[in-house]
Amino acid sequence: RIVALLPRGQAHARFAPKQTVSRPESILLPGLVNAHTHNPMTLLRGVADDLPLMPWLTEHIWPVEAAVMSPAYIADGGELAVAEMLRGGTTCCNENYFFPDVQAATYRRMGFRAVVGLPFIEFPSAWAASPAEYFDKGLEVHDNYRRDPLVSCSFAPHAPYTVSDE
């Protein structure tokens, strides 16, 4: 949180450090933001690589997701992804995947800042059976995290090819 914008001399006088660390061979950067993630899919890394998108999705990813999708799967994949992101300097993500309630709880528990997408898709999943259920459950997740300091929510239609015009 930015608390003041001051000339250097005034800043040093007003906010005198308790300790100074000299790292002449280092650089201090703000945390990076990964603006497009499907973090639980870290557990699917390497599945049918190097295929065109639609065959990859329809013949490989969606069938595997249908077989393994569960709250525990989402939490485990999210935890792994957060560990990997933190190791690389990423401190915030914009997420879009199933079980946003589990994802939000995972990010909160790990102290990781996230915008959790509330998915909309035209086919059933382990999280919701219909567009109306995706919407209703998404609103509930949104309401549960409305004032959370780390986790916020966004509506996240998946893609033009997985949602109707309605």
Outline where the language-model segments fall.
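Hydrophobic/aromatic beta-strand patches that form the interior of the parallel beta-sheet core
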Residues: 19-21, 33, 115
